[in-house]
């Protein structure tokens, strides 16, 4: 029988709505990755919140990583930031590379040192569109992707949040008035995060990059073969 490892992992996101959608996805991703690891790994995810007033991105990450280490003893911290474009390269180079450098410069055990970047293309809502069937179930519509103007690659939609809000509006127009209710996108983040299929997310390049980062973080802890 292999070794048993209990692993605290922390998550820091740009906003509270991002937490509602991403928390379960990060948990599921690590649990799936852990299947490939040596022995048995029990994952517990903790959401980190800080007062970020006046702090730049690197300072926010450092403060979150210090809290992650002090409160949970976490070596790994996942940090979310939207790409705000069709490529994650700029966000990676201008935000995450300096932040990782800063963490590595800190004294040992003063903060989480393994930074796992989570960078959706354009914005988090692009990941919601990875499973359009689930989205339509939650909206309560049988309209087609084309009728809802969602018949595109999620990562090619420059404003996925607006696209989802537009789809909700179109769907509501096709519901009998007495059965309508004012559904807002804010109500969808938590249930979609709980129900979305990781296999669907694998169709997105930005999620696959997050998956690779997760695998690499476990390798850095010598929990997986480094090959």
Q: Each predicted region: which residue ranges?
A:
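Short hydrophobic beta-strand that contains or immediately precedes a catalytic carboxylate
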Residues: 11-13
């Amino acid at each position: 029988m292999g070794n048993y490892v209990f692993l605290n992992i922390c998550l820091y996101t740009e906003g509270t709505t991002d937490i509602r959608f991403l928390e379960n996805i990060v948990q599921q991703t690590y649990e799936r990755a852990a299947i490939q690891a040596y022995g048995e790994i029990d994952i517990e995810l903790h959401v980190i919140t800080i007062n970020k007033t006046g702090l730049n991105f690197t300072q926010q990450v450092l403060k979150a990583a210090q809290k992650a280490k002090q409160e949970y003893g976490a070596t790994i911290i996942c940090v979310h930031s939207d790409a705000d474009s069709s490529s994650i390269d700029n966000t990676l180079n201008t935000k995450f590379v300096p932040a990782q450098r800063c963490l590595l410069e800190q004294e040992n055990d003063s903060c989480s040192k393994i930074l796992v970047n989570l960078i959706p293309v354009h914005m988090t809502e692009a990941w919601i569109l990875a499973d359009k069937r689930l989205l339509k179930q939650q909206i309560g519509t049988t309209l087609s992707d084309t009728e809802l103007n969602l018949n595109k690659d999620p990562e090619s939609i420059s404003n996925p949040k607006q696209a989802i809000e537009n789809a909700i509006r179109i769907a509501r127009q096709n519901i009998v008035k007495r059965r309508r209710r004012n559904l807002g996108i804010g109500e969808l983040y938590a249930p979609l995060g709980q129900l979305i299929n990781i296999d669907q997310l694998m169709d997105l390049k930005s999620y696959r990059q997050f998956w690779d980062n997760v695998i690499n973080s476990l390798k850095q802890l010598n929990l997986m073969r480094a090959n």
